[in-house]
Amino acid sequence: MDNKEAIIQATIRLIEENGEHLEEVTVREICKRAGVGLGLVNYHFGNKDKLIEQCIERMINGTVEH
């Protein structure tokens, strides 16, 4: 799994764990779970909101890997 996919999968897990409290999901926590550096979120997605948006779209479309 590449870094971008690791970030997406970690974010999806955190979204599932935190439910409606997305504001509690931090970039630092995402990166820790994904095993990547903080700068990679901005590199691949621009910001946390865009990352979360992409993850939610993926969850809705049913393309989540478990």
PLM features per residue range, with description:
Residues 1-2, 46:
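Generic N-terminal leader/processing signal
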Residues 31:
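The alpha-helix within a helix-turn-helix
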Residues 55-66:
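Amphipathic alpha-helical linker/stalk segments
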